[in-house]
Curated annotation (Swiss-Prot):
This is Serine--tRNA ligase. Its EC number is 6.1.1.11. The keyword ATP-binding applies. HAMAP family: Ser_tRNA_synth_type1 (MF_00176). One of its GO terms (cellular component) is cytoplasm. It comes from Bifidobacterium longum (strain NCC 2705).
Length: 428
């Protein structure tokens, strides 16, 4: 949610942000109109109620010949107060509905355009020349099946399309990768949290995911009415809902470990083979509560954390600055790290980190205590540190001619010193 005072004073900035996102500019006028109607209705209600109270005070001491008249006026005003209250409540509801539709204000530095209009910030690492090495690279599913580590057939049998089993050493590789991510986060002062994967509608709505991603989210209907999270960002944002935080000693930094669920509603025909685009996966997510003035510095820190982790798994990658039209409703700025996938001949997203400024905090009523005793909304930020999809890039970039997979050096200590995952015969 945005600050209504900012919208009133900087209407052009908010409209420009909506335009850059490809969203309704007219919505800003709707917000301002409903704000005016809300304030006028509230003023009328408060004036009528004050008048009612004033007359009520006079009734007790009024002479007998005036008392009946005053009582009649009180009853008439009571009816008006009730009507004004109803109008004020209705106006407030319309205002809130309009406000909650507005997306966060895009940072001026974010590129213009849509999904394909990102800007490449930099590329890191050398892409392997498999032709020079004398063999054609196998895709991650072929490799994973060959080492008895990915079982799509039985995953589909159990859960339906886009489900899978991770087995044996590939399952161990995922645990190793996620554990290594947690260790790195803790070294940087993050607190580990294993988070709920079911959340209340108010929390999901508060994070902004029901604005543009509602069709991607699994929902449990009555009598439960809960949502399955697609990232632990949701639970970590909701953890301090309706709280006043002490950020005097610096930001609150969490890393959440959770299973995640996504419907992939708009992904028909995309990445139907393997584990790139699936309904369930595991992820370690960073989440930060920071002072407003520290959010940009914290965003850079999260991106640096992601790069540190990518260096450990030794895959070529690039960083892109996501265009305004491809941002989620909560994000003011977002950077993605995309790893090179040899068999696809292109980069695929492994991480994203977003600065949500005060947008989520306003919606969830999360504030910080100021030195003067007052409060103000905090900034929230998030970033991926490791997830199941990383296995795709690791396996394909570390494959050997015989179908084995070399384990990245930094991960070996997490896999009992094992250096290579060898092909295995099994009934796939």
């Amino acid at each position: 949610m945005l600050d209504i005072q900012f919208i009133r004073e900087h209407t052009d900035i908010v409209k420009e942000s909506q335009r850059k996102r490809g969203e309704s500019v007219e919505l800003v006028d709707e917000v301002l109109s409903s704000d005016t109607a809300r304030r006028e209705a509230l003023k009328a209600f408060e004036e009528a109620r004050a008048q009612q109270k004033e007359i009520g005070k006079k009734v007790a001491s009024a002479p007998a010949d005036e008392k009946a008249k005053l009582i009649a006026e009180t009853k008439e005003l009571s009816q008006k107060v009730s009507e004004y209250k109803s109008k004020a409540d209705s106006a407030a509801e319309e205002y809130t509905t309009a406000m909650w539709k507005l997306s966060n204000i895009v940072e001026p530095e974010a590129p213009e355009g849509g999904e394909d209009d990102y800007v490449v910030v930099k590329k890191v690492g050398q892409i392997r020349d498999f032709a020079a090495e004398g063999f054609e690279p196998k895709d991650h599913l072929t490799l994973g099946t060959g080492v008895a580590g990915i079982d799509m057939r039985r995953g589909v049998k159990v859960g339906g399309s886009r489900f899978y089993f991770l087995r044996g050493q590939v399952a161990r590789m995922q645990i190793a990768m996620l554990t290594m991510a947690v260790d790195q986060a803790e070294e940087h002062g993050f607190t580990l949290a294993i988070t709920p994967t079911l959340v209340r509608p108010e929390v999901m709505r508060g994070t902004g995911f029901l604005n543009s991603h509602a069709d991607e989210i699994y929902r449990l209907r009555e009598p439960d009415d809960q949502y399955l999270v697609g990232t632990s960002e949701v639970a970590l944002a909701g953890m301090h809902e309706n709280e006043i935080l002490d950020l005097g000693n610096g930001p609150l930094r969490y890393c959440g470990w959770s299973s995640c669920y996504r419907r992939e509603a708009g992904a028909a025909g995309k990445d139907t083979s393997g584990i790139i685009r699936v309904h369930q996966f595991d992820k370690v997510e960073m989440f930060v509560y920071a002072k407003q003035e520290d959010s940009y510095k914290e965003h850079e820190h999260l991106l640096a954390m992601e790069q540190e982790m990518l260096a450990k798994v030794e895959v070529p990658y690039r960083i892109i600055d996501t265009a305004a039209g491809d941002l989620g409703s909560s994000a003011a700025r977002k950077f993605d790290c995309e790893a090179w996938v040899p068999t696809q001949g292109r980069y695929r997203e492994l991480t994203s980190t977003s600065n949500c400024t005060e947008y989520q905090a306003r919606r969830l009523n999360i504030r910080e205590r100021m030195e003067d005793g007052g409060t103000r909304p905090v900034s929230t930020l998030n970033g991926t540190l490791a997830t199941t999809r990383w296995l795709v890039a690791i396996m394909e970039n570390h494959q050997q001619k015989d179908g084995s997979i070399e384990i990245p050096k930094a991960m070996r200590a997490y896999m009992g010193g094992k250096e290579v995952i060898e092909p295995t015969k099994w009934e796939a």
